[in-house]
């Protein structure tokens, strides 16, 4: 059935409510809009669902959420784990509560017990709740840091980690097998409650979550020493972080926490934010203004579902606030935690440090410094969470720290997804520790570069929307795969890894070997002089990303080299 036939079927089928059909009929003369909404089904991929909110098969709406949930329910029933139940949470976005509720009622209609939070909660707390309640699965309704027109739906399994192979493919196949909306079950909330299938998660879960985070604190006594002097500015970006972040900082003894008022309360429109992403410097405009007013030591911001953290800190020399990349904040937390654990005799002899392949090579040197096994995984924090399960099952390593360049890390094993709440705690404690030594977080970052080398990373993302964009992205990847460049500007390619083919080619010898990682549409070019470039289409947005890294003799040299490598990449791919 073509997109126009599918569109007409939605307009005429009384399964869809009157408002939906009326809105669809209003676009009858706009064929391009109809095509974009109906040319494909919104893909339920390895990361779940992510798309623009609206009516149509290629949009996030209650019908698509129900259909995906029916597929998940069918899988759970085949696994025979429906009695363990499913935990559900959501963020502050438009339709988030409605989507969470629809998922809950679909599961209940299939005889699967549901535990749903009474209101918005962060992604890491959902991961924690799945483990705490011994559920078979979890659902988080969120589009993370995407623009306000987006929403999404992520699936977690019983270890609190987002689904990975082979279950991801098995669940995807079950979702695809639901082709008729009439096969999708639902039930009203009252009946679900009477049957004991619809349960509200109590506030004791919040208490347990905060208690688990506080176990990761290493220097509570030092916090008390500087509590009167250290000043923290925080923005939850109108999302889920506001309550848990303020609570944990208060309970740890921080007294001067200033919250950005315009970004404090839940706001699905993100009125003061063009893009609610801690990677975007413009998102810190309000926080920087407040920081200058109160003379803050550090500025922190969590994205709407509170799994990513952005950081600014004062530079003692200039007095200016400096921004940290996700690689920098990850390395700052790592060096603080590992040095303090070593000093206190808490480092494991068989400890492991986990990072994604597109994250900084500085991590390799920090892991070596603390005698940790460095493990690299594909892009996506679920692969870091999965490693913790492997460690436990095989009794191989003890998880010490894991991070990815996209502003996410996990301290502890209470959750199996990135956790900005515990990252806030770790960074504020680090700020207190270094303040007691007379330096700022930025000063300490420079100390880390002085110790290990001046690594610098960046990325270039190109958005290509709609059906045409998907074709362009695929062609760009095919060209790089079939005709891999031998040089990137002044850098020579030393090794070429095609993770889709599971093939690593050593350029000097022509030797080919497996990559050792699961199949993924990712191309990695290892260059000479510690430089590298990686290309991958985004799994959640209509864009292709190019990641790059260099090592310089100092900050300025690293900046210059990164600019040169970025220009070389742009020239190669025609951007």
Identify what each model region corresponds to:
Residues 156-186, 327-350, 355-364, 420:
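Glycine-rich phosphate-binding loop plus the immediately following alpha-helix
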Residues 99-107, 150-157, 307-327, 363:
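Short Gly/Thr/Asp-enriched flexible loops that form oxyanion-binding sites at enzyme active sites
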Residues 292, 296-298, 320-322, 340-536, ...:
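Phosphate-binding and adjacent anionic-ligand microenvironments
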Residues 11, 33-38, 42, 151-285, ...:
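Gly/Ser/Thr-enriched, mixed-charge loops and adjacent short helices
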């Amino acid at each position: 059935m073509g997109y126009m036939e599918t569109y007409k079927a939605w307009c005429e089928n009384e399964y869809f409510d009157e408002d939906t059909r009326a809105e669809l009929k209003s676009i009858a003369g706009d064929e391009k809009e109809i095509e974009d909404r109906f040319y494909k089904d919104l893909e339920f991929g390895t990361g779940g669902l992510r798309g623009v909110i609206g009516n149509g098969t290629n949009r996030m709406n209650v019908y698509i959420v129900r259909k995906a949930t029916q597929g998940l329910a069918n899988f759970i029933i085949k696994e025979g784990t429906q009695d363990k139940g499913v935990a559900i949470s959501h963020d502050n976005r438009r339709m988030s509560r409605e989507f969470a509720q629809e998922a809950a009622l679909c599961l209940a209609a299939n005889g699967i017990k549901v535990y749903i939070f009474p209101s918005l909660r962060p992604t890491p707390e959902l991961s924690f709740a799945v483990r705490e309640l011994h559920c078979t699965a979890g659902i988080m309704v969120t589009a993370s840091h995407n623009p306000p027109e987006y929403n999404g739906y992520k699936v977690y399994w019983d270890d609190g980690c987002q689904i990975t192979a082979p279950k991801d493919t098995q669940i995807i196949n079950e979702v695809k097998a639901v082709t008729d909306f009439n096969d999708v079950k639902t039930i009203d909330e009252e009946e679900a409650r009477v049957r004991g299938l619809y349960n509200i998660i109590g506030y004791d879960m919040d208490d347990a979550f905060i208690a688990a985070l506080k176990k990761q604190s290493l220097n509570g006594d030092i916090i008390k020493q500087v509590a009167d002097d250290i000043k923290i500015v925080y923005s939850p970006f109108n999302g889920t972080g506001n309550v848990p972040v303020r609570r944990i900082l208060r309970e740890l003894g921080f007294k001067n926490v200033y919250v950005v008022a315009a970004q404090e309360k839940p706001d699905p429109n993100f009125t003061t934010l063009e893009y609610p992403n801690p990677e975007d410097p413009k998102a810190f405009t309000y926080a920087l203004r407040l920081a200058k007013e109160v003379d803050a030591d550090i500025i922190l911001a969590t994205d709407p579902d509170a799994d990513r953290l952005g950081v600014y800190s004062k530079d003692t020399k200039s007095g200016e606030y400096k921004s940290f990349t996700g690689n920098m904040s990850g390395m700052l937390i790592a060096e603080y935690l590992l040095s303090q654990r070593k000093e206190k005799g808490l480092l494991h002899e068989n400890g492991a440090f986990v990072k994604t392949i597109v994250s900084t090579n500085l991590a390799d040197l920090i892991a070596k410094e603390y005698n940790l096994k460095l493990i690299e995984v594909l892009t996506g924090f679920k692969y870091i969470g999965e490693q913790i399960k492997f460690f436990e099952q095989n009794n191989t390593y003890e998880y010490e720290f894991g991070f990815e360049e996209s502003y996410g890390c996990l301290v502890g094993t209470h959750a199996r997804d990135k956790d900005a709440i515990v990252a806030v705690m770790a960074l504020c404690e680090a700020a207190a520790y270094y303040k007691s030594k007379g330096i700022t977080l930025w000063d300490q970052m420079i100390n880390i570069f002085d110790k290990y080398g001046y690594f610098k990373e960046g990325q270039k993302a190109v958005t290509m929307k709609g059906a045409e964009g998907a074709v362009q992205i695929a062609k760009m990847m095919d060209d790089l795969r079939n005709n891999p460049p031998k040089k990137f500007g002044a850098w020579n390619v030393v090794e070429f890894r095609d993770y889709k083919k599971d093939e690593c080619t050593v350029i000097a010898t022509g030797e080919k070997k497996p990559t050792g990682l699961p199949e993924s549409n990712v191309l990695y070019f290892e260059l000479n002089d510690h430089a590298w470039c990686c290309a991958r289409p985004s799994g959640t947005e209509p864009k292709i990303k190019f990641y790059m890294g260099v090592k310089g003799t100092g900050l300025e040299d690293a900046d210059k080299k990164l600019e040169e490598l970025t220009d070389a990449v742009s020239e190669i791919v025609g951007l």
